[in-house]
Amino acid sequence: MLDYDGTLAPFRVDRSKARPYTGVREVLARIQESGRTRIVVISGRPAREISPLLRGFPPVLRDPVEVWGLHGAERLYTDGRHEVEQVSPATQRKLDEVREYLRHSNLGGEIEDKPNAVVMHWRGASPRIARFIEQRARELFEPLVKLDGLMLLEFESGLELRVGRDKGGAVDTVIGEVPQGTPVAFLGDDLTDEAAFASVNRWSGPHLSILMRAEPRPTSAMLWMRPPSGLRGFLKRWKKVFGGKAVRVASAA
């Protein structure tokens, strides 16, 4: 299982330009072509944003991959089936009100539209502006966390007010779907991936949780690797070791 932004691809202020690190598509394509590994991306983005970025054009990866979007609230299967958790009308109205307020507040930063969340990004802003945006966003979001089903999700250079979901639920579902004893790995970089690491660690089996980022930080992940060399090396090793066995890999973003 793999996260996308910050794990498979470097962060970009313009998220539409966040393409995988050099060589990553090619090694994922070889893993996919072996027919022995299920590749799953688990991202905070809407699921349909991931496949075009990951596969490239023309596609390097022959087939679609399974994508869990919105931190696990959305699932896009390889055959095109799509499931998304519904938000109650009352909660949706509140999120719409907050989103509309932010659009007219001139805070700076960037508002990301998600059906189940309001997201404020300040990546690329100066430290002074970033602190200002974060403070104002917290002042707006934190009182609303008390509402039923809403939670505040912190990540690098952003805050997300969302319906209560995290990547751990997606990881639990994926692991629960594969035969006992199947090797599973989750690779992620951000604070939003900690729930996924914790879920992997709770399951008994030959599983790995890996923090993939330039510098180490406190984490529940079992291992730390530095991208992009650590990422490419891990994926190549996975292909070499498990190329002839039926295995499952899941990915986050």
Where are these regions (language model features)?
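Mg2+-dependent phosphoryl-transfer enzymes with acidic/Ser/Thr/Gly-rich catalytic loops
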Residues: 168-253
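Conserved acidic, metal-coordinating active-site core of Asp-based
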Residues: 105, 112-187, 191-207
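Short glycine-/acidic-enriched loop or helix-start segments at secondary-structure transitions
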Residues: 11-12, 50-53, 196-197, 221
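Conserved Rossmann-like nucleotide-cofactor binding loop
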Residues: 7, 47, 192
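Asp-based phosphoryl-transfer active-site loop
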Residues: 1-14, 41
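Short loop/turn segments at strand-loop or loop-helix junctions that form parts
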Residues: 2-7, 70-73, 115-116, 121-123, ...
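A short acidic, often aromatic-flanked loop/helix-cap motif at beta-alpha or helix-coil junctions
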Residues: 73-76, 118-119, 158-162, 217-218, ...
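Active-site phosphate-binding/coordination module
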Residues: 19-114
